[in-house]
Amino acid sequence: MVFEWDNKKNEYNKKKHDGIGFEFAVRVFLDEKRIEKYDYKHSTATEDRWNVIGMVDDVLFVVYTERDDKTRIISARKATQEESDEYYDNYDFR
């Protein structure tokens, strides 16, 4: 996979989400137990968005889109308790 992101958005994301940068968040795609879902709420006629929940030191929630054969990171943050529960319950390995 080839990743890209907007550098200004990445800096904003770090400030907003406890230092979680996109260069760190891309590691979520290495998690074989990750959960990926289509984001119906935020997708548009011109852009499909996806959510992925996976483990990178802690459970992360990452939003991305596919653009020109690249995975473009839109946002990344620590998963909420509900999202973490979904991740752990899906594989029952707590």
Where are these regions (language model features)?
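Ribonuclease/tRNase effector modules and their secretory precursors
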Residues: 1-94
